[in-house]
Amino acid sequence: MRTTYMAKPNEVERKWYVIDAAGKPLGRVASEAAKLLRGKHKPEFTPHVDTGDFVIIINAEKAVLTGKKLEKKMFYRHSRYPGGLKAIPYGILMKTNPVLAFEKAVKGMLPHNRLGRKLFKKLKVYAGESHPHQAQKPEIWQF
């Protein structure tokens, strides 16, 4: 009888990938990043093991939101005090802090447990063109 292959954490080879978000919808870039972080693009994907790669997202400020999401979609946070709910439209958030918009989108697409928190640490988002990870020799991910 054959058994399903289960990857072990020390057997996994990790690569670095760069995703250019310029002119692409935020959600599509975020879903590709989540797929790479989980390792679902690899044949040795194992759901309960970190088999994913490192992901660098550049040009976060040049990403687009389709439809009327810039005005209608809101970013919520709460101070945990009564009346402490803050609501910021994504149009303002993308101008002031596009990195936070990408991090929130990708984090929502990862598992909501210890593994997801570990995977999220392998995501690096930068608003501009440059990034400090040239020494890792990242590959460009096209989709």
Curated annotation (Swiss-Prot):
This protein is one of the early assembly proteins of the 50S ribosomal subunit, although it is not seen to bind rRNA by itself. It is important during the early stages of 50S assembly. SUPFAM superfamilies: Ribosomal protein L13. One of its GO terms (cellular component) is cytosolic large ribosomal subunit. Gene3D superfamilies: Ribosomal protein L13. It comes from Carboxydothermus hydrogenoformans (strain ATCC BAA-161 / DSM 6008 / Z-2901). This is Large ribosomal subunit protein uL13. The keyword Ion transport does not apply. One of its GO terms (molecular function) is mRNA binding. GO terms for biological process: negative regulation of translation; translation. PANTHER family: LARGE RIBOSOMAL SUBUNIT PROTEIN UL13M, RIBOSOMAL PROTEIN L13. Part of the 50S ribosomal subunit. Belongs to the universal ribosomal protein uL13 family. Keywords: Ribonucleoprotein, Ribosomal protein.
